[in-house]
Amino acid sequence: MKAINKIIILGMVTTLFSSCDLTLLPENAVTPENYFQNKSDLELWTNQFYTLLDEPDASAGTNADDMIDKGMGQVIEGTRSAASETGWSWSKLRHINYFLQHSSNCDDETARSQYNGVAQFFRAYFYFVKVRRYGDVPWYNQVLGSEDQELLAKARDSREFVMDRILKDFEDAATSLPTKSTDTRNTRVTKWAALAFASRAALYEGTYRKYHGLDNYEKYLEIAASTAKQFIDESGFSLYKEGTEPYRDMFCADNAKTTEVVLARVYNFEGLQLSHSVQFSIANLQMGFTRRFMNHYLMTDGTRFTDKQGYETMFYTDEVKDRDPRLQQTVLCPNYIQKGETTVTANDLTAYCGYRPIKFVGTKEHDGAAKSTSSTRICLENANELSANFRNSSSLAQIPLPRPPSA
């Protein structure tokens, strides 16, 4: 009888365990099944997207063709090639699409909508960078695996196809994101950041098409104008006007001027060892603007500097007179006094071409070390640019141009 009882008990235990799923998800690994469950999960995952924004580094934009330093650059030297490029990376897009594919696990609809907006903003930003760099690129809005060979090998989508989806992502992000940054320093994307970047992207595409003889440029210029106007009318941002040199002050302040700066990066060298090396690079790489860059600045009466008789041979101290005030707050000009100093800093002509940048330049202590903390080093978008976007896109598209508020 005891033997029978043991057999029955053993059978019951066997049946019990055979009816259970013994596959346990690892508790220390992030999987779709155990993550994206709440607002905190969504926020933590989307935090990584902010690394997509322009990284501060020692190059400080020297690869552009309006600036030169002692190291030159591939663009200026004419040595840039497909083989030397390093921007054909798609891993961050995968992280974004992975999030959008699994964020539905979160039951908090408000949080889900907000962070989906963050992901859509950064997908649009990711692709805008790619279009500017490569033109036609393949559009992916899903996570690809090794078995998706056909999609992985597909041809590039047209520039217009991708740009339309970029603008749609920015539009969707604007409807989902909050109107105020979740911190007081405007380091988080908002509805206004989405509208600002949408306007920037549309203006870029519209002018690119107009000056390259491509169709549909009017469509993008109209989007740029209407989006910028909405920002101007509704955002509450205004031009920073304090002090005698507000433009210069805005770009060398340790704390972003949040009345104007829509999206900024904040640095903290002492506590977090977060800094940038722009000022160090300007001082030690002999960075200088080109003459062509200088010629872009208009006269104070709105006429072109290059229409001025004898502009080609004009002496340095004369060519900077009566120009757009932003010139003297961007380039070292006579009577320049560095932040924290009381005496004039003379132009020692160590900068190539002689036109030394002062934008982002703070106190002298940052000249000798890569410890700059000016928050608006990454002034990713500001109200001044949106006002310019509105007027430029409206004029190019020949839209009736009301005067935007002066803020």
For each feature predicted by the language model, list its residue ranges.
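Sec-dependent signal peptide recognition
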Residues: A3-L10
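C-terminal motif of bacterial Sec signal peptides marking the signal peptidase cleavage site
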Residues: L16-S19
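An aromatic- and glycine-enriched ligand-binding surface/loop that stacks and positions planar moieties
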Residues: D21-M72, N141, F170-D172, R188-C353
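Conserved, well-structured interaction surfaces
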Residues: Q37-N47, T51-E55, K70-G135, E150-D164, ...
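Short, flexible, mixed-charge acidic loops at enzyme active sites
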Residues: D136-G145
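Short helix/strand-bridging catalytic loops that position acidic/His residues to coordinate divalent metals
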Residues: E147-K154, H212-N216
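Surface-exposed, extracytoplasmic segments of Gram-negative outer-membrane nutrient-acquisition systems
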Residues: I337-C379
